[in-house]
Regions:
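Short inter-helical turns and helix N-cap capping residues of alpha-solenoid HEAT/ARM repeat scaffolds
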Residues: 16-17, 48-49, 79-80, 110-111, ...
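Amphipathic alpha-helical scaffolding segments comprising HEAT/armadillo-like alpha-solenoid repeats
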Residues: 2-14, 33-45, 65-77, 96-108, ...
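Alpha-helical, heptad-rich or low-complexity scaffold/stalk segments
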Residues: 244-252, 283-286, 305-323, 330-333, ...
Length: 459
């Protein structure tokens, strides 16, 4: 019967062969389910080998819920060092915040295996109310090997706060009087928030070299893209120490940002003037390939003639223009056709022949419509002119008067408008600029860069 079987299995827990003991632990759990937990815990308390501990831990994980994990508490006081370590690991596996107070004292245990298990477990057990305890421990711990685990625990506790705007509050208060800023500041990358970002930027600007390094690493690992503006400023400053990693951090944060493709394109354009190497340009082109917009395609197309960027540009253009797995339609138009025709010639890599064939096939099936025209070429004011009156007044003017006034308006354009760094610049005074052609179906993507006393708009 079952009782005789269980008796045999229980006896097997004491077998000399560790493999038999491991099988016995698994068998007891399989046969008795949660009812096996007390016997397995008793075995855990007396087992001296790591193999036995791993076997009983596995068996307990297969049958334990919150009620069963609570039975482990006596092991923390009565069990051997190796049993306490296993109990702590099981509590961490359960992720019950109620065990934080049980485990916390063992983070200072003189027994290294127990101490290491406890420190690592805190990240799974900590809640918002436990932050000050973790800050005290993180600030005072002597063994630097534990710093990263305690930082993870503090981040876990803070981010458990349901209100994202206050997740950094406890840490920020502690930083006002802490002598361990270098340990607390990196956690702010996970907790985020404007006040936290402002503090890190201030410490970066005013701190000593070591603090500047810590703050910079915090900025590049910031959890959302709100630090991208700071990283851009570091890139623009041409700081030789931080500039390269700031560039890469900016690209990473924009790539993962929860913003539209159009907004990402504007940010990539913003950093593009500082992509002075082919590697940087190709990194931006790789990211452009993720943006299914016409402006992204047109921008990628401008890099097709440079041998150092043509391959990355071609790959990006192909991915942008051709239909995706989610859509049966791709992009079309004269500019698209021109870019894809050149793309087919620039593709490289092991799948280049296949990709080339795919592009050629798509070109053959593309609608013959003219498609979108670019209103601004990024180089000069071709297609733009000075504005004469408003449309209603202009429609009532004699042709000869309109032509004369248009010539006068055009003469004023160079004094008021110019192109620099791929942008149309207005000096803040003078007349309006308008397109030469009239457009009835258009998409306008505008990146406002208005400086102090700026005066410009669209109507």
């Amino acid at each position: 019967g079952d009782e005789s079987v269980l008796t045999i299995i229980s006896i097997a827990l004491q077998d000399e062969d560790y493999r038999v003991r491991a099988e016995a632990a698994a068998a007891i759990a399989a046969v008795r389910g949660p009812a096996a937990v007390p016997e397995l815990i008793e075995f855990m308390k007396n087992a001296t080998g790591q193999t036995d501990q791993e076997a009983v831990k596995s068996a307990l994980m297969s049958v334990s819920g919150n009620k069963e994990i609570a039975l482990l508490k006596p092991v923390l006081t009565d069990g051997s060092s190796i049993a306490r370590k296993t109990a702590i690991e099981l509590m961490a596996w359960n992720k019950g915040n109620e065990y934080f107070r049980e485990v916390l004292p063992f983070a200072s245990s003189p027994e290294e295996p127990v101490r290491a298990a406890a420190v690592k477990a805190l990240a799974s057990l900590a809640g918002p109310a436990d932050q000050n305890d973790l800050i005290n421990l993180l600030s005072s711990v002597q063994d630097k090997a534990y710093i990263a685990d305690l930082q993870s625990a503090l981040a876990s506790a803070a981010t458990a706060n349901d209100d994202p705007s206050s997740r950094s509050d406890v840490i920020l208060r502690a930083l006002k009087s802490s002598t361990a800023k270098e340990r607390l500041i990196p956690v702010l990358a996970k907790t985020g928030g404007k006040d936290a970002l402002d503090l890190v930027l201030n410490e970066f600007e005013l701190g000593n070299p070591d603090m500047r390094d810590i703050c910079f690493k915090t900025l590049t690992s910031w959890g959302d893209y709100t630090a991208s503006t700071a990283l851009y400023e570091i890139v623009a400053s041409r700081n030789k120490t931080f500039e390269d990693q700031a560039f890469r951090g900016f690209i990473r944060q924009v790539r993962t940002a929860p913003i539209t493709d159009e907004q990402k394109l504007l940010l990539y354009r913003k950093i593009l003037p500082f992509a002075l190497s082919a590697d940087r340009k190709n990194e931006i082109l790789t990211q452009l390939g993720r943006l299914k917009t016409y402006p992204a395609l047109f921008l990628a197309g401008t890099f097709l003639d440079d041998p150092e960027t043509s391959s990355a540009a071609a790959s990006a253009a192909m991915v942008i223009a051709l239909p995706s797995a989610e859509s049966n339609t791709g992009m079309y138009g004269n500019i698209v056709r021109e870019i894809l025709t050149k793309t087919a010639q620039k593709l490289t890599g092991p799948e280049s022949e296949y990709n080339k064939e795919m592009v050629v096939k798509y070109l053959a099936s593309m609608p013959s419509d003219e498609g979108f025209k670019s209103m601004f070429n990024g180089k000069d004011l071709t297609g733009w002119q000075g504005l004469v009156e408003n449309p209603i007044v202009r429609s009532k003017m004699r042709r000869v008067d309109l032509e004369r006034r248009q010539e006068e308006a055009n003469l004023m354009v160079p004094a008021n408008w110019s192109v620099k760094d791929g942008c149309i610049w207005f000096n803040g005074k003078g007349s309006n600029l308008c397109s030469v052609q009239e457009y009835g179906d258009f998409e306008m993507l505008v990146d406002w860069k208005i400086t102090k006393k700026g005066d410009s708009g669209i109507y």
